[in-house]
UniProtKB/Swiss-Prot annotation:
One GO cellular component, as annotated: cytoplasm
Modified residues (N6-(pyridoxal phosphate)lysine): K265
Gene that encodes the chain: hemL
Gene Ontology terms, MF aspect: glutamate-1-semialdehyde 2,1-aminomutase activity; pyridoxal phosphate binding; transaminase activity
Top-tier EC class: isomerase
The protein, known as: Glutamate-1-semialdehyde 2,1-aminomutase
Family named by the database record: Belongs to the class-III pyridoxal-phosphate-dependent aminotransferase family. HemL subfamily.
Recorded metabolic or biological pathway in which this protein acts: Porphyrin-containing compound metabolism; protoporphyrin-IX biosynthesis; 5-aminolevulinate from L-glutamyl-tRNA(Glu): step 2/2
Assembly and oligomerization: Homodimer.
Amino acid sequence: MNKSESLYAAAQQLIPGGVNSPVRAFNGVGGTPLFIERADGAYLYDADEQAYIDYVGSWGPMVLGHNHPAIRDAVIAAAERGLSFGAPTEMEVQMARLVTSLVPSMDMVRMVNSGTEATMSAIRLARGYTGRDKIIKFEGCYHGHADCLLVKAGSGALTLGQPNSPGVPADFARHTLTCVYNDLSSVRAAFEQYPDEIAAIIVEPVAGNMNCVPPLPDFLPGLRALCDEFGALFIIDEVMTGFRVALAGAQSHYGVVPDLTCLGKIIGGGMPVGAFGGKREVMQALAPTGPVYQAGTLSGNPIAMAAGFACLTEVAKPGVHEKLTALTNQLAEGLLAAAKAENIPLVVNQAGGMFGLFFTDAESVTCYQDVMKCDVERFKLFFHMMLEEGVYLAPSAFEAGFMSLAHTPQDIDRTIEAAQLCFSRL
């Protein structure tokens, strides 16, 4: 038994499933999860000191790579001044100024502690601002584990939502409508059925929780137009895509302006941070200036703000996103060529610094139904083969991969070589 196996056995006696977030348990691929000892640059080192090229990046935040000196130094300096005050700090003002300067659709921003808090709060704000109860989300999109968002479609796209987790009351779920990602007709039908009841649409601009599915050209502009037509707010969940697909987020890359934006992951530089913001008129409905309540003991934590400010300062430097996209292109093109050489049907989707692998005979993957037709069993085999070759992919066929600025062309060449070897064995 290696150390990861020993630690996992102990963890299962103390922590539900042995992990503090379900996907880490490797249930999607089988086997024992890696317990990580340390990380540096593009590499993870497990408890047995095995090194892996990392394409998970802590599920997105580590866009600069692990243990980046600017972030590390900022955290150390902030910690020397105190860990938490429960009072406003200058760094909160600086962070808010930086975020709103980078994302033009955000006139004001409120800091929270996670992406789930950001989406949950944005939806509450949208409901309070509009005086409406229903929201629209999309099949295959994940916006955190708030009750109103753990909802699946019913027998049809317009069926009132049904909970997909025990513990979520049906009365909560019925206010959530689930439509088809990249299908505007399903969204229009929902609005026409409930024209005065829908407070907001919430959408991942690139669906990163059914692997990686970018929007079709007319999808996001079409959602914006429908919200305007029916008086609903347009919420873009950039927890995963923010500062990764483009500096101002996927919304700038795809040319749409939301009413509210949710942020997380990169905004904290590896620390637990979320944020939501948008139009001044809407944001001023939040307490203490307005009636919509939202609060948090650790919101705006000085350590987290220091890490986030350092990270965004680096990310905002010229050429960063061009480099990130070029590295992702190199990986995607290399994987496709390697798969073709071994007669393995593969689709690779990408958007900026994120990507997704789909074992499928289809020419493209554009929606949840396409994703569900992919060969999950083949992915499981591929995942473990790549792990043996020292490459750490997301341990699920339904999670996106992430590039960092710490990856080198040589790291990517090594990854492609490993993939071709694994493809030859599938």
